[in-house]
Regions:
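Anionic coordination/interaction segments
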Residues: 1-362
Length: 362
C-alpha cells in the first residue's frame, strides 16, 4: 500500500493517509529549541536537552501509539475532528501531511471546513510556531470552536515519568489574557518557564488536564471539547496542560488565521520577578516581546520563509545531477537533511531513543 510520495520541487515528503504503519516523524529546529512531530501531530518539544529541559510530555508505550502531541480540536455541531486526524480519529474528507525541511504542514477538511496547519521552529528563536488557517468552503456561514491542547512535562523527563508522589503536588501555572505560563518549580529553583499563547482573544482556557479531559476522560473526546465549554481551570499540582478556546465564525469563502506559540523563556536570576520575589509575579517581559514577534500571519509567514531560505542555502553547497532521479533526491535533499538532524540531535531524541538516557544534543 502506498502512503505518500516525494515532492522534490518543494523538498517535501507528502503523506496521503494518516494511517501509516508507524508514526512518520519530522524534526523541527536547527539550534537550541527542537520539536518532534508525527504525521498525526503527535510528538514533543524540548530546549537543548531532551531529558532535563523538556517542555511537553510524551508517553512512548502509550496505547494507542503516538497519542500525545500538540493538538487542535475543531468542533462544529456534533462533529469533532483534528487537522492531523489524531486523537479524535474522525474520518476526514481530505488529508495530507507535508514533511518539509524543518517544517510540517497539514491540509485537511471536514464538511466543507478546511484546515491548514503549519508547524515550525523559527531560525534563532526558542519557540515553535503553529499557524492554523481555517477556510469555509461551503455556501453558508459556519460557526464552530477551536480548542488547542498541549500537556506540559515537569521539565525533567525521567523524573516526570517516575517520581509521582512528588510530581502530583508540584505543577504550577498562571494565565494572562491569551497566554498560558507553565512555571513549575520557578519559585523554588528554576529561572525558566514555558509559554503557550495565541494571537487572538480567547473565549476560555484550561490548564488542568483532568478538568479538560473530564473524569475518566481521554484525549480522543475531552469533556471540555464535547461540551463546547472551557472550564477556565488553573492547575495546582497533578498534570498541567495548556488549552485555548476560540469561537470562530466564517462567512462563505472566508478564511481566518491564528498563530500559536510554544516557547522556552529564561530569565537571568536577578530578573526572575517583577517587584519582590515574595509577591510571586514572574517576569514576563521576554515572553511578551517574543509574542509580539509572531502576533500576525504576516510575521509568521516571514519567519517560515526565512527558515526555508536557511535550508535552501544549507543544501546548496553540494549537489549531484545523474541519470537516476532517486539518487539525486537522496543525495541532494534527504541525506543532507538527515545528517544535519543527526548532528543537531546528537542522536539523542526520537520515538525510539527517548532522550532520557543521556539527553544530550549539540
Amino acid at each position: 500500500m502506498k502512503f505518500g510520495y516525494f515532492d522534490d520541487a518543494n523538498k517535501e515528503y507528502v503523506i496521503t493517509s494518516p494511517k501509516t504503519p508507524l508514526p512518520w516523524i519530522n524534526y523541527l529546529g536547527s539550534e537550541n529549541f527542537f520539536s518532534l512531530i508525527s504525521n498525526t501531530c503527535g510528538g514533543y518539544s524540548f530546549y537543548k536537552d531532551a531529558k532535563l529541559l523538556r517542555l511537553t510530555r510524551y508517553r512512548y508505550n502509550n496505547v494507542p501509539f503516538d497519542s500525545n502531541g500538540h493538538y487542535y480540536y475543531i468542533k462544529e455541531g456534533d462533529t469533532i475532528w483534528n487537522p492531523g486526524w489524531m486523537p479524535a480519529k474522525t474520518d476526514l474528507d481530505a488529508y495530507e501531511c507535508h514533511h518539509g525541511m524543518g517544517y510540517s504542514t497539514f491540509r485537511s477538511s471536514k464538511n466543507d471546513l478546511q484546515a491548514e496547519l503549519t508547524a515550525f521552529v523559527p531560525v534563532g528563536k526558542n519557540c515553535e510556531i503553529n499557524q492554523l488557517t481555517l477556510t469555509n468552503n461551503s455556501k453558508e456561514t459556519k460557526d464552530f470552536s477551536v480548542f488547542s491542547y498541549v500537556e506540559f512535562c515537569l521539565w525533567n523527563a525521567m523524573d516526570d515519568m517516575t517520581n509521582f508522589q512528588r510530581n502530583f503536588s508540584t505543577g504550577e501555572v498562571e494565565v494572562h489574557g491569551s497566554a498560558i505560563y507553565h512555571k513549575t518549580e520557578y519559585r523554588e529553583r528554576r529561572n525558566h518557564y514555558a509559554l503557550y499563547a495565541v494571537n487572538a482573544p480567547v473565549d476560555g482556557f484550561d490548564t488542568d488536564r483532568d478538568s479538560f479531559l473530564g473524569a475518566y476522560g481521554e484525549n480522543s473526546a475531552p469533556e471540555v471539547v464535547v461540551s463546547d465549554q472551557s472550564k477556565n481551570s488553573i492547575a495546582s499540582g497533578w498534570a498541567p496542560v495548556g488549552s485555548h478556546h476560540l469561537k470562530v465564525s466564517l462567512a462563505p469563502g472566508e478564511s481566518k488565521t491564528f498563530v500559536f506559540i510554544l516557547a522556552y523563556i529564561e530569565n537571568p536570576v536577578e530578573e526572575k520577578w517583577i517587584g519582590r520575589a515574595e509577591d510571586g509575579k514572574i517576569n514576563r517581559t521576554r515572553a511578551e516581546a517574543l509574542m509580539k514577534e509572531f502576533d500576525t500571519k504576516e510575521k509568521s509567514e516571514a519567519a517560515l520563509a526565512e527558515l526555508k531560505k536557511y535550508w535552501d542555502e544549507l543544501l546548496s553547497h553540494f549537489t549531484v545531477s545523474s541519470s537516476e532521479e532517486k539518487l539525486d533526491r537522496m543525495v541532494n535533499i534527504w541525506h543532507q537533511y538527515q545528517c544535519m538532524v543527526t548532528f543537531n540531535m546528537s542522536r539523542s531524541a526520537s520515538y525510539f531513543e527517548s532522550g532520557i538516557g543521556r539527553g544530550m544534543g549539540f
